[in-house]
Amino acid sequence: MASLSLAPVNIFKAGADEERAETARLSSFIGAIAIGDLVKSTLGPKGMDKILLSSGRDAALMVTNDGATILKNIGVDNPAAKVLVDMSRVQDDEVGDGTTSVTVLAAELLREAESLIAKKIHPQTIISGWREATKAAREALLSSAVDHGSDEARFWQDLMNIAGTTLSSKLLTHHKDHFTKLAVEAVLRLKGSGNLEAIHVIKKLGGSLADSYLDEGFLLDKKIGVNQPKRIENAKILIANTGMDTDKIKIFGSRVRVDSTAKVAEIEHAEKEKMKEKVERILKHGINCFINRQLIYNYPEQLFGAAGVMAIEHADFAGVERLALVTGGEIASTFDHPELVKLGSCKLIEEVMIGEDKLIHFSGVALGEACTIVLRGATQQILDEAERSLHDALCVLAQTVKDPRTVYGGGCSEMLMAHAVTQLANRTPGKEAVAMESFAKALRMLPTIIADNAGYDSADLVAQLRAAHSEGHITAGLDMKEGTIGDMAVLGITESFQVKRQVLLSAAEAAEVILRVDNIIKAAPRKRVPDHHPC
């Protein structure tokens, strides 16, 4: 019998790459920890910002401390790093805030796992311990949650505190009170629906952030056509996505040969008649306002003006979609059956000035909760970051209106969970207890990083905070204004229960997924097949 060759056999295509066992695990740990280190300096009320500069001729500049935005705009090649980037994006989509916290917690868990594996503790043992730790942490968080949903005054104060806590780590922190009030008023107008599409945010250069305001209505950043009414009461609105520029022949590759200018005039006349018929079909809907996503050329604009109809062109797709939502209409593309088209309505449409720009204001819209937040600022970067910050606050508030449970911030919740996990580890025999203790240590790293970013002695503060929780002061947290331990209930540093819960579960799941990896296989790049049949 022939002996088997001991030479390694490569079963992959040429160009494919494979990392095995410790090499694969180390590669995953390094990538994930690097992502955590990248964003951890942005954590907390005194976190730093990042400048993101895209390459190319039209290099865009972005200044932000939003974890999801940073990770979304950096290109990562490491598979484990991509897992954390995707997790951060999901956190942003689900609850709107906690994107940096979830990334940092997952990275710290993997940092702890790296040292445990170096001590010859099996990944499955670590995962088993982490699952028990996650369960204990979630129960501790749930038991500490406070629900003021039935008390209107206290719930309103909770919303103000949550918005203030969310904005305290953002660019808007210096105008926190102003924007907290704006965000809470806007979300309470939704009457519990949580439909953030009804809140429109417009950015206008000029003035300062303090000049931003909430407008009870809908603002469209467009201009009304020439020689048309600038104000309409009891508006009936047809919202359309149709071509109103057919003053040219639109047959691909067509050519027309004429032997006189009279023939050219005939073609133009035919085109005008065709457009006139289309405008007449639109006017049969009994409207006094026509809003089109596409361009409206001069001739149809004149026809609308002569009929006393306000025509608004080039309302971008997002604007048209939101306008259909708030006015109660539907977007139409054909106009042969007026009875099938649902028109939008509002009490008043008028042109208004903001700074040096003209906008169209819709008031008394069908969707009564619709409103617009107008952001003012000195530079485009400030406006963009203000919009991102406000979006986070609005998402968290909408989530809190649905689930009114709140927990305390300032590292209080993390220390509370860490204390519960440590107590469980002390009662658990075997190596799983070591994994549980590592989970608690990772949770304690969040208040440590918050204190470090503020320039305080994190070792001293976290030791004091840990001692306070051990003595039963479950509302103790970090007061980053004074650099001491404070009572979060008194300071009003409150966060949404759903945000904290999502941070805990997402980070634990992502860390577990990465820890399970013992092989990374990169597929061979696809080769281009030469085209043997050129056109």
Curated annotation (Swiss-Prot):
Principal location class: cytoplasm
Sorted UniProt keywords: Acetylation, ATP-binding, Chaperone, Cytoplasm, Hydrolase, Isopeptide bond, Magnesium, Metal-binding, Nucleotide-binding, Phosphoprotein, Ubl conjugation
Keyword hit for Acetylation: yes
The EC number(s) this enzyme carries: 3.6.1.-
Coiled-coil boundaries: none
Intracellular or extracellular location(s): Cytoplasm
Sites of Phosphothreonine modification: T261
Protein name: T-complex protein 1 subunit beta
Modification after translation, per record: The N-terminus is blocked.
A GO CC term attached to the entry: myelin sheath
Modified residues (Phosphoserine): S3, S260
Family affiliation: Belongs to the TCP-1 chaperonin family.
Transmembrane is among the record's keywords: no
Annotated catalysed reactions: ATP + H2O = ADP + phosphate + H(+)
Gene3D superfamilies: GroEL, GroEL-like equatorial domain, TCP-1-like chaperonin intermediate domain
Any one GO molecular-function label of the UniProt entry: ubiquitin protein ligase binding
Record location of the Glycyl lysine isopeptide (Lys-Gly) (interchain with G-Cter in SUMO2) cross-link: K248
Pfam families: Cpn60_TCP1
The protein's assembly and partners: Component of the chaperonin-containing T-complex (TRiC), a hexadecamer composed of two identical back-to-back stacked rings enclosing a protein folding chamber. Each ring is made up of eight different subunits: TCP1/CCT1, CCT2, CCT3, CCT4, CCT5, CCT6A/CCT6, CCT7, CCT8. Interacts with PACRG. Interacts with FLCN. Interacts with DLEC1. Interacts with SVEP1.
Function description: Component of the chaperonin-containing T-complex (TRiC), a molecular chaperone complex that assists the folding of actin, tubulin and other proteins upon ATP hydrolysis. The TRiC complex mediates the folding of WRAP53/TCAB1, thereby regulating telomere maintenance. As part of the TRiC complex may play a role in the assembly of BBSome, a complex involved in ciliogenesis regulating transports vesicles to the cilia.
Catalytic class of the enzyme: hydrolase
Biological process annotations from GO: binding of sperm to zona pellucida; chaperone mediated protein folding independent of cofactor; chaperone-mediated protein complex assembly; positive regulation of telomerase RNA localization to Cajal body; positive regulation of telomere maintenance via telomerase; protein stabilization; scaRNA localization to Cajal body
N6-acetyllysine modifications at: K13, K181
Source organism of the structure: Mus musculus
Annotated positions of the N-acetylalanine modification: A2
